Amino acid sequence: MTLQENELIKIRRDLHQIPEIGLEEYETSDYLLKIINGLPQENLEIKRWKTAILVHLNGENKNYTIGYRTDIDGLPVEEKTGLPFSSKHEGRMHACGHDIHMTVALGVLSYFASHRPKYNMTFIFQPAEENASGGMKLYQSGELDEWMPDEIYALHDNPQLPAGTIGCRKGTLFAGTCEIHVKFIGKSGHAAYPHQANDMVVAGAQFVNQIQTIVSRNVDPIQSVVVTLGHFSAGTTGNVISGVCQIDGTIRALTQENNLLIQKRVRTIAEGIAHSFDCELEIDLHQGGYYPVENDDNTTEAFINYMKNEDDVDFVETLPAMTGEDFGYLISKIPGTMFWLGVDSPYSLHSEYLAPKEESIMLGVNAITGYLKNRQESLNK
């Protein structure tokens, strides 16, 4: 039984109403499992890890496995779309389109459950993309080991592309990210007696200024990186010298090499400031599973060639995005390709008004199913 467009739209609307935060997607996971259990089971094996669902399709040839991953979590956003199928969970919304992601994955899975593939396939319904490096945690759990893909694919919806348009590029699609948390600890005191205190506002200001040299003086200017310090907190009132300064920010880089370089420079600068101001330092640079999504040359060339030459697919080559995606961790372990699916919305990802066009669902299912069928036939393993 291949799921039809009206069924997929109903599934999407059902999922849209029950968004849940990462590793708390219990209702979502149960709903997905209900749909999966309704598909032909002859070649299916299913297992769960926390709120993740792994579905393995036994192909005619069992010495190669193609993977497909979707994320399943929502965001802590209060929905304001006014849709009749708006979120029923207060303060929760599928504001990043993961309801679209899941629905497309179910549509593709339903085809291959009904038409046995040439090679094995593993479908990964992954929790906690937004907040907790769910892909990395699932991979490191070992639950994927027996069904480990030899190559893997995933999509992300794109409000800026027309509904159903496929976008992709060789190289990096999403930047790798790293959170910066720095605290300088000195000594508070009266504003009139600075010599009896150790002013962390000044220390923090020096840190902010020196961080600006990383992009301009340590990184190849041809390569895109961003270091943003978005939070600076120190002091309580104007006549008290602050003994503590908390600074938080983010790193964005299109290669893991540059991400690690920037992390090293941030740490070195923070340690230098602490030494020069004779203060204590607490620093946490947290990347987790948010590696750059660096598409594999082989799988991406095959993907782009298929999409470019398929009459029923509108394809565009896209630029890299400086946003993060935890598929970067999986693709650092398994060669593969991530791509965009256009959903044509005037509102951006993570907006409380995001309302993807539903015609993108079937167009996405058809394009991806067509590619995976073609990929299966072209492989000679």
UniProtKB/Swiss-Prot annotation:
It comes from the Bacteria. It is an enzyme of class 3 (hydrolase). This is N-acetyldiaminopimelate deacetylase. One of its GO terms (biological process) is diaminopimelate biosynthetic process. The keyword Hydrolase applies. NCBIfam families: amidohydrolases. Keywords: Amino-acid biosynthesis, Diaminopimelate biosynthesis, Hydrolase, Lysine biosynthesis. The active site is at 71, 130 (proton acceptor). Catalyzes the conversion of N-acetyl-diaminopimelate to diaminopimelate and acetate. InterPro entries: AcetylDAP_deacetylase, Amidohydrolase, Bact_exopeptidase_dim_dom, Peptidase_M20, Peptidase_M20_dimer. Its EC number is 3.5.1.47. It holds the Pfam family M20_dimer. The keyword Transmembrane helix does not apply. It catalyses: N-acetyl-(2S,6S)-2,6-diaminopimelate + H2O = (2S,6S)-2,6-diaminopimelate + acetate.
